[in-house]
Amino acid sequence: MKYKETIAIVNDPDVTLGSLENNNIKSLNAWELKWEEMTNSYDYIILGGHMGAYDTDKHEYLLSENKWLSKSVDNGTKILGICLGSQLVADSLDGEAYLSDEIEFGFKNLNFVRNEEIFSDFQETEVFTWHRDTFKIPSKAKLIA
């Protein structure tokens, strides 16, 4: 299977690609982008941040990113949302990001609910979580883990 080049959208300067940085994935800062010039010729990873998708008063670029995400999904662009990124994808479609009543904190095993070949190397992966935001899954989205 041939994959397109992947671009990671960084939403917070403190939340980067980390160990994926050297895997031929280009990073772009969301707050510096001209969203109207973004193309659908890439696959995208939308990274997390300390804010919630609903914090648009403090982070106005999230509004432009949200509009771009909606158009990109409609155009068939492949998008992986991680943490805040998944909230933004949900908000751009018919889902909804919101503050949960519970805090999730600590190391957790990834729990895959779909068998996707692209994630086969991550089947036994432990990740660190620290968030209180969650979202309703949009009808166009696929829950993978």
Give, region by region, the residue ranges found by the protein language model.
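Pocket-forming structural segment of enzyme catalytic cores
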Residues: 93-145
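N-terminal beta1-alpha1 cap of cysteine-dependent amidohydrolase-like domains
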Residues: 1-75, 111
